[in-house]
């Protein structure tokens, strides 16, 4: 993997760059649609590629390990072939899902014992076997196994957890060297900064991760319920320490406003279920604010979903029609809303990149944040 930093914004820490892997070029800042179980919910791969057009999508190690299971993925020749996707994929390590989905999880130094949310069976994740699982899945960018702490989190617990995440990182790195890639292309490995919302812990963790000297770095444990101001404060601290010549990935973030504010602080990569999940609940993101398409005010609004026309659904269907589909609980409504939201997120990061390259990101960002903060 290669990262080229092309331009720094003169009035902020925002950056524009490119990440190059064996599956192609990723233009940063980038948003990665979440394809949890080898699909971005409600979107065909052809629509995803031709219309939404992301350079990279995300898969979840925890979910793919449980179903379809790594044996099937290996027989298929890896996740790219299994899901017919020839662009980049990033997989998380499963640490967050173990934290968020598993009712009965037991964390110890060796690893995490957890109960499957599918059938109640017990499984054990260690830094070593998670590296092996990610080798078999075959994503272009793979993540270290970490513990994601909740918010709020006791200081002493956050410190112990962070130190264990660092020890797990060392085990990941040591084991990865012993497990060759399986499908003839390279995999980049990113470690993860933790430390909850404690400034000193975030500094310690960022220094440890920077010293690990990997090709890219991630920030985890944010967007777990903390106020946005705390998220931004932690991101700022960490970005001051992480090396400038490597991509920075803020995991699980966020709203369109969160994304712009964190680009301002020096983040290059984002993923979040928000555009897809909120779409299925009738929330549409636009450059002028959010729309709850279920509201009665749209019942006889025959204007296009979004006159900007970022994706084909925006001008082919009206707000009234989309509202009707939600009222009738038709699958098509959720699908249209999902394509719209993902298209908008991709437009947003591409516009951000355009304005960074033009040198006027800061005033554009401030205008966009003000506009997007409205409910329509």
Predicted regions and their residues:
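Short, solvent-exposed loop/turn segments at secondary-structure junctions
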Residues: 33, 63-64, 96-97, 149-150, ...
């Amino acid at each position: 993997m290669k990262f080229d930093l092309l331009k720094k914004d003169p009035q902020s820490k925002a950056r524009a760059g490119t990440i190059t892997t064996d599956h192609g070029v990723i233009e940063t800042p980038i948003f990665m649609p979440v394809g949890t179980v080898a699909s971005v919910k409600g979107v065909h791969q052809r629509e995803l590629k031709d219309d939404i057009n992301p350079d990279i999508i995300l898969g979840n190690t925890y979910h793919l390990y449980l179903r379809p299971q790594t044996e099937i993925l290996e027989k298929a020749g890896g996740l790219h072939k299994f899901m017919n996707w020839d662009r980049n994929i990033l997989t998380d390590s499963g640490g967050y899902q173990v934290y968020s989905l598993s009712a009965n999880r037991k964390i110890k130094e060796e690893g995490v014992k957890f109960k499957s949310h599918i059938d109640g069976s017990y499984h054990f994740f260690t830094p070593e076997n998670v590296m092996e699982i990610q080798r078999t899945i075959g994503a272009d960018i793979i993540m270290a196994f970490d513990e994601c702490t909740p918010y709020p989190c006791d200081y002493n617990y956050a410190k112990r957890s962070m130190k264990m995440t660092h020890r797990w990182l060392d085990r990941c790195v040591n084991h990865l060297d012993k497990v060759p890639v399986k499908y003839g292309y390279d995999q980049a490995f990113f470690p993860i900064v933790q430390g909850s919302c404690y400034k000193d812990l975030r500094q310690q963790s960022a220094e440890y991760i920077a010293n690990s000297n990997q090709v890219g770095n991630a920030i985890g444990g944010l967007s777990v319920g903390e106020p946005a101001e705390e998220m931004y404060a932690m991101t700022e601290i960490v970005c001051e320490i992480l090396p400038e010549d490597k991509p920075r990935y803020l995991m699980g973030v966020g709203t369109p406003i969160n994304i712009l504010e964190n680009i301002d602080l020096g983040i290059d990569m984002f993923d979040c279920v928000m555009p897809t999940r909120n779409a299925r609940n009738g929330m549409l993101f636009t450059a002028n604010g959010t729309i709850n398409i279920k509201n009665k005010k749209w019942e006889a609004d025959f204007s296009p979903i979004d006159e900007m026309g970022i994706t084909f659904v925006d001008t082919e269907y009206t707000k009234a029609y989309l509202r009707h589909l939600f009222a009738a609980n038709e699958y098509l409504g959720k699908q249209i809303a999902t394509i719209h939201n993902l298209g908008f997120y991709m437009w947003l990061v591409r516009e951000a990149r355009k304005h960074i390259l033009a040198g006027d990101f800061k005033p554009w960002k401030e205008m966009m944040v003000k506009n997007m903060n409205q409910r329509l």
